Protein backbone atom coordinates (compact mmCIF):
# COMPACT_ATOMS: atom_id res chain seq x y z
CA UNK A 1 0.00 0.00 0.00
CA UNK A 2 1.22 3.47 -0.88
CA UNK A 3 0.10 6.34 1.33
CA UNK A 4 0.67 10.08 1.14
CA UNK A 5 -0.71 12.41 -1.51
CA UNK A 6 1.78 12.56 -4.38
CA UNK A 7 -0.52 13.66 -7.20
CA UNK A 8 -1.25 17.16 -8.46
CA UNK A 9 -2.32 16.78 -12.09
CA UNK A 10 -4.78 14.08 -13.15
CA UNK A 11 -5.34 13.18 -16.81
CA UNK A 12 -8.66 11.69 -17.92
CA UNK A 13 -8.77 9.36 -20.91
CA UNK A 14 -11.96 7.92 -22.40
CA UNK A 15 -12.84 5.33 -24.96
CA UNK A 16 -13.50 7.12 -28.24
CA UNK A 17 -16.78 6.68 -30.09
CA UNK A 18 -18.46 5.13 -27.06
CA UNK A 19 -22.10 6.02 -26.45
CA UNK A 20 -22.96 7.51 -23.07
CA UNK A 21 -19.36 8.09 -22.00
CA UNK A 22 -19.49 11.90 -21.96
CA UNK A 23 -21.60 12.15 -18.82
CA UNK A 24 -19.49 9.84 -16.61
CA UNK A 25 -16.30 11.56 -17.78
CA UNK A 26 -17.71 14.99 -16.97
CA UNK A 27 -18.89 13.71 -13.60
CA UNK A 28 -15.47 12.24 -12.86
CA UNK A 29 -13.71 15.45 -13.91
CA UNK A 30 -15.88 17.50 -11.55
CA UNK A 31 -15.37 14.98 -8.74
CA UNK A 32 -11.58 15.12 -9.08
CA UNK A 33 -11.36 18.90 -9.58
CA UNK A 34 -13.52 19.49 -6.50
CA UNK A 35 -10.83 17.84 -4.41
CA UNK A 36 -8.18 20.30 -5.55
CA UNK A 37 -6.49 18.37 -8.34
CA UNK A 38 -5.71 19.90 -11.71
CA UNK A 39 -7.68 17.99 -14.35
CA UNK A 40 -6.54 17.63 -17.95
CA UNK A 41 -8.10 15.60 -20.76
CA UNK A 42 -6.54 13.52 -23.49
CA UNK A 43 -7.12 15.60 -26.62
CA UNK A 44 -9.02 13.02 -28.67
CA UNK A 45 -11.25 12.25 -25.69
CA UNK A 46 -12.04 15.94 -25.19
CA UNK A 47 -12.83 16.38 -28.87
CA UNK A 48 -15.05 13.29 -29.05
CA UNK A 49 -17.20 14.21 -26.06
CA UNK A 50 -17.14 17.96 -26.68
CA UNK A 51 -15.96 18.87 -23.20
CA UNK A 52 -14.42 22.29 -22.56
CA UNK A 53 -12.94 24.07 -19.59
CA UNK A 54 -10.01 21.70 -19.17
CA UNK A 55 -6.65 21.58 -20.98
CA UNK A 56 -6.64 19.06 -23.86
CA UNK A 57 -3.28 17.33 -24.20
CA UNK A 58 -1.66 14.77 -26.47
CA UNK A 59 -0.47 11.53 -24.85
CA UNK A 60 3.11 12.84 -24.93
CA UNK A 61 2.01 16.04 -23.18
CA UNK A 62 0.11 13.98 -20.61
CA UNK A 63 3.25 11.95 -19.96
CA UNK A 64 5.26 15.10 -19.39
CA UNK A 65 2.69 16.94 -17.28
CA UNK A 66 0.29 14.56 -15.51
CA UNK A 67 1.10 12.61 -12.35
CA UNK A 68 -1.52 9.93 -13.02
CA UNK A 69 -4.00 8.99 -15.75
CA UNK A 70 -7.51 7.74 -15.06
CA UNK A 71 -8.81 5.64 -17.95
CA UNK A 72 -12.54 5.16 -18.49
CA UNK A 73 -13.25 2.47 -21.05
CA UNK A 74 -12.47 -1.15 -21.77
CA UNK A 75 -9.24 -3.10 -21.78
CA UNK A 76 -8.46 -1.88 -25.31
CA UNK A 77 -8.50 1.74 -24.16
CA UNK A 78 -6.19 0.86 -21.29
CA UNK A 79 -3.83 -1.02 -23.61
CA UNK A 80 -3.64 1.86 -26.06
CA UNK A 81 -2.88 4.64 -23.59
CA UNK A 82 -0.64 2.33 -21.55
CA UNK A 83 1.66 1.78 -24.52
CA UNK A 84 1.86 5.52 -25.18
CA UNK A 85 2.50 6.54 -21.57
CA UNK A 86 4.91 3.73 -20.69
CA UNK A 87 8.06 5.77 -21.50
CA UNK A 88 6.89 8.40 -19.00
CA UNK A 89 6.11 5.91 -16.19
CA UNK A 90 2.70 7.53 -15.74
CA UNK A 91 0.55 5.40 -13.39
CA UNK A 92 -2.85 4.29 -14.65
CA UNK A 93 -6.17 3.86 -12.84
CA UNK A 94 -8.65 1.78 -14.83
CA UNK A 95 -12.44 2.25 -14.72
CA UNK A 96 -14.41 -0.37 -16.61
CA UNK A 97 -16.80 1.04 -19.20
CA UNK A 98 -16.36 -1.87 -21.60
CA UNK A 99 -17.29 -5.52 -21.48
CA UNK A 100 -14.64 -7.81 -20.01
CA UNK A 101 -12.45 -5.52 -17.94
CA UNK A 102 -9.48 -7.65 -16.88
CA UNK A 103 -7.28 -4.58 -16.43
CA UNK A 104 -9.90 -1.88 -15.85
CA UNK A 105 -10.82 -3.11 -12.40
CA UNK A 106 -12.97 -0.30 -10.92
CA UNK A 107 -16.67 -0.46 -11.77
CA UNK A 108 -18.05 2.77 -13.22
CA UNK A 109 -20.62 2.88 -10.43
CA UNK A 110 -17.81 2.98 -7.85
CA UNK A 111 -15.52 5.54 -9.48
CA UNK A 112 -16.64 8.59 -7.47
CA UNK A 113 -16.04 6.71 -4.23
CA UNK A 114 -12.77 4.95 -5.11
CA UNK A 115 -10.83 7.30 -7.41
CA UNK A 116 -10.52 10.12 -4.81
CA UNK A 117 -9.25 7.59 -2.26
CA UNK A 118 -6.56 6.40 -4.66
CA UNK A 119 -5.61 9.97 -5.52
CA UNK A 120 -5.27 10.70 -1.81
CA UNK A 121 -2.43 8.19 -1.76
CA UNK A 122 -4.13 4.99 -0.60
CA UNK A 123 -3.66 2.33 -3.23
CA UNK A 124 -1.94 -0.89 -4.21
CA UNK A 125 0.61 -0.47 -7.01
CA UNK A 126 1.88 -3.04 -9.46
CA UNK A 127 4.12 -2.87 -12.51
CA UNK A 128 2.97 -4.55 -15.72
CA UNK A 129 5.48 -5.75 -18.31
CA UNK A 130 5.49 -4.80 -22.00
CA UNK A 131 6.99 -6.44 -25.06
CA UNK A 132 9.02 -4.75 -27.75
CA UNK A 133 9.27 -6.24 -31.22
CA UNK A 134 10.94 -5.51 -34.50
CA UNK A 135 10.60 -7.05 -37.94
CA UNK A 136 13.82 -7.94 -39.71
CA UNK A 137 13.95 -8.22 -43.51
CA UNK A 138 17.18 -9.06 -45.29
CA UNK A 139 19.06 -8.31 -42.09
CA UNK A 140 17.57 -4.84 -41.64
CA UNK A 141 14.86 -3.67 -39.23
CA UNK A 142 11.79 -2.43 -41.11
CA UNK A 143 9.22 -2.02 -38.34
CA UNK A 144 9.22 -1.56 -34.58
CA UNK A 145 6.37 -1.67 -32.06
CA UNK A 146 5.60 -2.30 -28.42
CA UNK A 147 2.79 -4.46 -27.07
CA UNK A 148 1.07 -4.61 -23.72
CA UNK A 149 -0.74 -7.92 -24.26
CA UNK A 150 0.83 -9.81 -27.11
CA UNK A 151 2.62 -10.04 -30.42
CA UNK A 152 0.68 -12.37 -32.73
CA UNK A 153 2.00 -13.86 -35.97
CA UNK A 154 -0.88 -15.39 -37.91
CA UNK A 155 -2.32 -16.19 -41.29
CA UNK A 156 -5.05 -14.20 -42.98
CA UNK A 157 -8.59 -15.52 -42.92
CA UNK A 158 -8.42 -16.99 -46.43
CA UNK A 159 -4.96 -18.58 -46.52
CA UNK A 160 -3.71 -21.95 -45.33
CA UNK A 161 -1.44 -22.79 -42.45
CA UNK A 162 1.85 -20.99 -41.95
CA UNK A 163 5.16 -22.59 -41.09
CA UNK A 164 7.18 -20.77 -38.45
CA UNK A 165 10.68 -21.34 -37.16
CA UNK A 166 11.09 -20.30 -33.53
CA UNK A 167 14.32 -19.81 -31.62
CA UNK A 168 15.06 -18.49 -28.14
CA UNK A 169 18.30 -16.75 -27.19
CA UNK A 170 19.82 -17.89 -30.48
CA UNK A 171 18.95 -21.54 -29.86
CA UNK A 172 16.61 -23.34 -32.23
CA UNK A 173 13.33 -24.41 -30.60
CA UNK A 174 11.11 -25.84 -33.36
CA UNK A 175 9.40 -25.47 -36.69
CA UNK A 176 5.63 -25.57 -36.45
CA UNK A 177 2.74 -25.55 -38.88
CA UNK A 178 -0.27 -23.77 -37.46
CA UNK A 179 -2.58 -20.80 -37.86
CA UNK A 180 -0.03 -18.71 -36.00
CA UNK A 181 1.90 -18.12 -32.79
CA UNK A 182 1.17 -15.82 -29.85
CA UNK A 183 3.91 -14.25 -27.74
CA UNK A 184 2.21 -12.88 -24.63
CA UNK A 185 3.04 -11.03 -21.44
CA UNK A 186 1.49 -12.17 -18.15
CA UNK A 187 -1.14 -9.46 -18.68
CA UNK A 188 -1.81 -10.84 -22.17
CA UNK A 189 -2.10 -14.40 -20.91
CA UNK A 190 -5.80 -13.75 -20.24
CA UNK A 191 -6.39 -12.35 -23.73
CA UNK A 192 -5.97 -14.14 -27.10
CA UNK A 193 -3.51 -16.58 -25.52
CA UNK A 194 -6.17 -17.84 -23.11
CA UNK A 195 -8.63 -18.53 -25.93
CA UNK A 196 -5.90 -20.60 -27.60
CA UNK A 197 -5.55 -22.81 -24.49
CA UNK A 198 -2.56 -20.97 -23.06
CA UNK A 199 -1.86 -20.86 -19.32
CA UNK A 200 -2.79 -17.95 -17.07
CA UNK A 201 0.30 -16.15 -15.78
CA UNK A 202 0.01 -13.99 -12.69
CA UNK A 203 0.79 -10.37 -13.68
CA UNK A 204 3.75 -10.24 -11.31
CA UNK A 205 5.33 -13.39 -12.75
CA UNK A 206 8.53 -12.71 -14.68
CA UNK A 207 7.70 -14.72 -17.77
CA UNK A 208 6.69 -14.69 -21.42
CA UNK A 209 4.38 -17.34 -22.86
CA UNK A 210 4.43 -18.76 -26.40
CA UNK A 211 1.07 -20.19 -27.48
CA UNK A 212 0.48 -21.90 -30.86
CA UNK A 213 -2.79 -21.11 -32.62
CA UNK A 214 -4.50 -24.29 -33.88
CA UNK A 215 -1.24 -26.21 -34.43
CA UNK A 216 -1.13 -29.07 -36.95
CA UNK A 217 0.53 -31.30 -34.34
CA UNK A 218 -1.08 -31.54 -30.90
CA UNK A 219 2.40 -31.94 -29.42
CA UNK A 220 3.02 -28.25 -30.13
CA UNK A 221 2.10 -26.97 -26.68
CA UNK A 222 2.36 -23.58 -24.97
CA UNK A 223 5.62 -22.89 -23.18
CA UNK A 224 6.50 -20.29 -20.55
CA UNK A 225 9.92 -18.68 -20.95
CA UNK A 226 12.01 -16.46 -18.68
CA UNK A 227 11.17 -12.81 -19.25
CA UNK A 228 14.72 -11.97 -20.31
CA UNK A 229 14.41 -14.33 -23.29
CA UNK A 230 15.04 -13.07 -26.81
CA UNK A 231 12.55 -14.73 -29.15
CA UNK A 232 12.89 -14.92 -32.93
CA UNK A 233 10.10 -16.16 -35.21
CA UNK A 234 10.93 -16.64 -38.89
CA UNK A 235 8.35 -17.03 -41.65
CA UNK A 236 9.32 -20.28 -43.39
CA UNK A 237 6.17 -21.07 -45.36
CA UNK A 238 2.67 -19.85 -46.07
CA UNK A 239 1.16 -16.76 -47.64
CA UNK A 240 -0.68 -13.67 -46.42
CA UNK A 241 1.05 -13.76 -43.03
CA UNK A 242 0.58 -10.80 -40.67
CA UNK A 243 1.95 -9.71 -37.33
CA UNK A 244 -0.32 -7.91 -34.86
CA UNK A 245 0.58 -5.89 -31.78
CA UNK A 246 -2.22 -6.01 -29.19
CA UNK A 247 -4.50 -6.68 -32.18
CA UNK A 248 -4.51 -2.90 -32.77
CA UNK A 249 -1.73 -2.46 -35.31
CA UNK A 250 -0.35 -4.88 -37.83
CA UNK A 251 1.85 -5.21 -40.83
CA UNK A 252 2.12 -7.77 -43.64
CA UNK A 253 5.06 -10.15 -43.70
CA UNK A 254 7.08 -11.85 -46.41
CA UNK A 255 8.82 -15.22 -46.50
CA UNK A 256 12.04 -15.22 -44.45
CA UNK A 257 11.01 -12.16 -42.45
CA UNK A 258 11.91 -12.56 -38.79
CA UNK A 259 10.00 -11.09 -35.85
CA UNK A 260 12.26 -10.47 -32.86
CA UNK A 261 10.50 -10.11 -29.51
CA UNK A 262 11.83 -9.32 -26.06
CA UNK A 263 10.62 -7.72 -22.87
CA UNK A 264 10.56 -3.93 -23.09
CA UNK A 265 12.66 -1.83 -20.75
CA UNK A 266 9.43 0.04 -19.94
CA UNK A 267 6.70 -1.07 -17.56
CA UNK A 268 3.23 0.32 -16.92
CA UNK A 269 2.32 1.12 -13.29
CA UNK A 270 -1.24 0.22 -12.29
CA UNK A 271 -2.88 1.70 -9.20
CA UNK A 272 -5.60 -0.43 -7.59
CA UNK A 273 -7.95 0.21 -4.67
CA UNK A 274 -6.85 -1.17 -1.32
CA UNK A 275 -7.93 -4.80 -1.12
CA UNK A 276 -7.60 -5.45 -4.85
CA UNK A 277 -7.35 -9.16 -5.63
CA UNK A 278 -6.25 -10.58 -8.98
CA UNK A 279 -7.90 -13.85 -8.03
CA UNK A 280 -11.22 -12.12 -7.46
CA UNK A 281 -10.89 -10.67 -10.96
CA UNK A 282 -10.32 -14.15 -12.39
CA UNK A 283 -13.28 -15.56 -10.49
CA UNK A 284 -15.56 -12.83 -11.76
CA UNK A 285 -14.41 -12.62 -15.36
CA UNK A 286 -13.98 -16.36 -15.95
CA UNK A 287 -17.03 -17.34 -13.90
CA UNK A 288 -15.11 -19.54 -11.53
CA UNK A 289 -16.88 -20.71 -8.38
CA UNK A 290 -20.32 -20.07 -9.85
CA UNK A 291 -22.16 -21.56 -6.89
CA UNK A 292 -22.74 -19.43 -3.82
CA UNK A 293 -19.90 -19.58 -1.33
CA UNK A 294 -19.08 -18.04 1.99
CA UNK A 295 -15.39 -17.99 1.10
CA UNK A 296 -14.60 -14.35 0.37
CA UNK A 297 -11.25 -12.60 0.21
CA UNK A 298 -10.05 -11.91 3.70
CA UNK A 299 -7.54 -9.23 4.58
CA UNK A 300 -4.20 -10.68 5.52
UniProtKB/Swiss-Prot annotation:
One of its GO terms (cellular component) is cytoplasm. SUPFAM superfamilies: NAD kinase/diacylglycerol kinase-like. NAD(+) binds at residues 75-76, 149-150, 177, 179, 190-195, 214, 248. One of its GO terms (molecular function) is NAD binding. It comes from the Bacteria. Its cofactor is a divalent metal cation. One of its GO terms (biological process) is NAD metabolic process. It is found in: Cytoplasm. Its main location: cytoplasm. The active site is at 75 (proton acceptor). It catalyses: NAD(+) + ATP = ADP + NADP(+) + H(+). Keywords: ATP-binding, Cytoplasm, Kinase, NAD, NADP, Nucleotide-binding, Transferase. InterPro entries: ATP-NAD_kinase_N, ATP-NAD_kinase_PpnK-typ_C, NAD/diacylglycerol_kinase_sf, NADK. Belongs to the NAD kinase family. Involved in the regulation of the intracellular balance of NAD and NADP, and is a key enzyme in the biosynthesis of NADP. Catalyzes specifically the phosphorylation on 2'-hydroxyl of the adenosine moiety of NAD to yield NADP. This is NAD kinase. It comes from Burkholderia lata (strain ATCC 17760 / DSM 23089 / LMG 22485 / NCIMB 9086 / R18194 / 383). The lineage of its organism: Bacteria, Pseudomonadati, Pseudomonadota, Betaproteobacteria, Burkholderiales.
Amino acid sequence: MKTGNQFNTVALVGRSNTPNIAEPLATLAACVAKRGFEVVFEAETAREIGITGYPALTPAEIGARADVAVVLGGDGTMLGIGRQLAPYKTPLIGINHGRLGFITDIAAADMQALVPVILSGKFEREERALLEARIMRDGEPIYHAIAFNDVVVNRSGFSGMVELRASVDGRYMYNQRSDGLIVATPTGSTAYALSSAGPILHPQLAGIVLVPIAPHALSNRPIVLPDDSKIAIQIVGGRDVNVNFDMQSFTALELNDTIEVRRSKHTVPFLHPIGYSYYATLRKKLHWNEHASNEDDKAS
